[in-house]
Amino acid sequence: MLERLKDSLIRSPIIKRGEYNYFIHPISDGVPSIDPHLVEEISDYISEIADMNVDTILTVEAMGIPVANALSLKTGIPLTIVRKRPYFLEGEVELSQSTGYSKGVLYINGLKKGDRIIIVDDVISTGGTLLALVRALQTIGVEVMDVISVIGRGDGYLKLRELGVEPKILVTIDVGEKGVEIKDVFGNQ
């Protein structure tokens, strides 16, 4: 179950940014090259465990796009990308997001009250981006049927529970100076 993903995470190089051990991985960074078989493994697994009775697959640019696009191609469900710049379209929703290492503004277009969506993201660590996104979607009246993160690090996912959302994290990791340790795999009971 998710063997390519687990193996690739364990082999991830680690760099130090201040006191933070940062892992470099194709799914979270696009470096090194993104293996299409890895993306296929991930999208296949998501299609099995997620509520796919939705109108749209939603992801935040940039690194959620490869997996969300593969899932869209596999299921035939349209893909909507939350962008980091405005397009000034009617109905565009602006939201501020803050993570442990950055702050920014995101823009949602093309969604309306009553839409049913699944959110697919590459990594959840602090939970800041997904928390702001889910709040904005709930304000619009969009039904968040599922939240999927390929990789989880830390306990930022707990913040989503405050909004009634229980994210599914495919692989939960811990990152130390010596490397990535797999802590849990979704569905591995």
Swiss-Prot record:
Catalyzes a salvage reaction resulting in the formation of IMP that is energically less costly than de novo synthesis. GO terms for cellular component: cytoplasm. Pathway: Purine metabolism; IMP biosynthesis via salvage pathway; IMP from hypoxanthine: step 1/1. InterPro entries: HGPRTase-like, PRibTrfase_dom, PRTase-like, Pur/Pyrimidine_PRTase. This is Hypoxanthine/guanine phosphoribosyltransferase. Belongs to the purine/pyrimidine phosphoribosyltransferase family. Archaeal HPRT subfamily. It is found in: Cytoplasm. Signal peptide: none annotated. One of its GO terms (biological process) is IMP salvage. It catalyses: IMP + diphosphate = hypoxanthine + 5-phospho-alpha-D-ribose 1-diphosphate; GMP + diphosphate = guanine + 5-phospho-alpha-D-ribose 1-diphosphate. Homodimer. HAMAP family: Hypx_phosphoribosyltr (MF_01467). Gene3D superfamilies: 3.40.50.2020. SUPFAM superfamilies: PRTase-like. Keywords: Cytoplasm, Glycosyltransferase, Purine salvage, Transferase. GO terms for molecular function: guanine phosphoribosyltransferase activity; hypoxanthine phosphoribosyltransferase activity. The keyword Iron does not apply. It comes from Methanosarcina mazei (strain ATCC BAA-159 / DSM 3647 / Goe1 / Go1 / JCM 11833 / OCM 88).
